[in-house]
Amino acid sequence: MILTVTLNPAIDVSYPLDELKCDTVNRVVDVTKTPGGKGLNVCRVLNEFGETVKATGCIGGESGDFIINHLPDSILSRFYKISGYTRTCIAILHEGNQTEILEKGPMLSVDEIDGFTHHFKYLLNDVDVVTLSGSLPAGMPDDYYQKLIGIANLNGKKTVLDCSGNALEAVLKGDSKPTVIKPNLEELSQLLGKEMTKDFKALKAVLQDELFEGIEWIIVSLGADGVFAKHKDTFYNVDIPKIKIVSAVGSGDSTVAGIASGLANDEDDRALLTKANVLGMLNAQEKTTGHVNMANYDKLYQSIKVKEV
């Protein structure tokens, strides 16, 4: 079983517009609202892929109830209730672009943070892999993911971390290391304090930096150019085909779902990387965030090339 953790979930609202006009009224006909937050995208894709998945995080208010009520029944909902209200995040799709408006989310008390920590420990009993995704809610210290990873490690669970900024830096500088991290080039540049490009030689060098010591997998997203990955002492480039992108929202989360599934099923490197990229691409072909059309899975799987470099 896979446990997905979304500490700062949201209701994701999508507004498609032919044109975004500033300083005037924009009327939207086709509005989509879904339970959101990176970890919830992960759990929906895992569910559609056929994995047994349990979802947790901190939710509150009517917006929190919306999330529970709109997740598929086959996902085991194990959320922790807080006093604040779950946030709303808006994506405006216009002229081939995407503009996002993201609420910060609720402030958690010390008691609520401690309560979730105990809740998390309890949920680990029957899981193999834990995914930790997205931003931390207000009130949580930057090293909170580090704390959860330490607990998971003590219980023999594999962990996939997908976050950025101070939370990611705290984990990299801490003692407890996740099994996998999945930065993109922008996040990698921020971590290292220098601009990174898609140059394989440069990527190979920086992924051997002591900052990443102790992390088994580092999977760097290159967007439409695929992935550059390091597993222990082996490096891979993943070439992906060109596809028509409907919406890239949630594609990185779908990739995390593939990584978690690969770990849970003890797949070899090539199978894990291929599955992860296929699920990310399938999500990009859909309007709905965190959704994949499995009818297209096999065709895309055959088109992906994983090369050791």
From Swiss-Prot:
This protein's pathway: Carbohydrate metabolism; D-tagatose 6-phosphate degradation; D-glyceraldehyde 3-phosphate and glycerone phosphate from D-tagatose 6-phosphate: step 1/2
Reaction catalysed by this enzyme: D-tagatofuranose 6-phosphate + ATP = D-tagatofuranose 1,6-bisphosphate + ADP + H(+)
A Gene Ontology BP annotation from the UniProt entry: lactose catabolic process via tagatose-6-phosphate
CDD domains (alphabetical): FruK_PfkB_like (cd01164)
Assigned GO CC terms: cytosol
Entry's EC annotation: 2.7.1.144
Coiled-coil segments: none
InterPro entries: LacC, PfkB_dom, Ribokinase-like, Tagatose/fructose_Pkinase
GO molecular function: ATP binding; phosphofructokinase activity; tagatose-6-phosphate kinase activity
Domain of life, per lineage: Bacteria
Keyword set includes Kinase: yes
Keywords: ATP-binding, Kinase, Lactose metabolism, Nucleotide-binding, Transferase
Family label: Belongs to the carbohydrate kinase PfkB family. LacC subfamily.
Protein name: Tagatose-6-phosphate kinase
